């Protein structure tokens, strides 16, 4: 099984998402973060479940979508995936770490 490593950038994104939603509803904020984490967990059994990120031309940088959020990840090897960032579709796409 593949290990998921949430990079600091992705953890920061989760906190920002939580804080933004929690301004209206802490219950829904917790629910949204839980859904994002559950969606990412499918990568443990299928690293290639996501599609290639259109902003980058690499088979190893992929995304899975949950609602308006794109979970961007990099396949490091057959045992490790880095979750790089969580991107809301309405926002400008940031540069990825090299």
Residue locations for each model-derived region?
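Basic, Lys/Arg-enriched alpha-helical interface segments
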Residues: 1-56, 60
